[in-house]
Amino acid sequence: MSQWKNICKIDDILPATGVCALLGNEQVAIFRPYHSDQVFAISNIDPFFESSVLSRGLIAEHQGELWVASPLKKQRFRLSDGLCMEDEQFSVKHYEARVKDLSLIHI
């Protein structure tokens, strides 16, 4: 990515949770699955219901992959690329995310 944007501090996200942030006009769900500085970012919009809810979903691990389950009907989206586990015809946009200088999350 050519232009990284500061989003929030890593400490703004409790481990095993997500938050929603605005990146331009897009809602981005940012997840911190563990106590480490590993973060993932996908669209916050559930494509099945067109609702802004994915940041409030439950994070789970299945067969070595991290997923978030939508709080609505529990469809799971892979955090590494946004693919829907239940129906591969659906996916959400994935964003590159990193932690810079041990504190700031960049997308």
Question: Language-model segments: what does each one mean?
Answer:
Residues 105-107:
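Conserved small/polar residues in nucleotide/adenosyl-binding loops
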Residues 8-38:
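N-terminal first-folded block
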Residues 21, 30, 59-60, 77, ...:
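A structural signal for short hydrophobic beta-strand segments in well-ordered beta-sheet cores
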Residues 52-55, 79:
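Short, non-ligating residues that shape and space the ligands of small metal-coordination modules
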Residues 83-90, 94-96:
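C-terminal structural segments of small proteins and small subunits
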Residues 46, 70:
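Short cysteine-rich clusters marking metal-coordination/redox-active sites
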Residues 32-41, 56-68:
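Immediate flanking context of iron-sulfur cluster ligation sites
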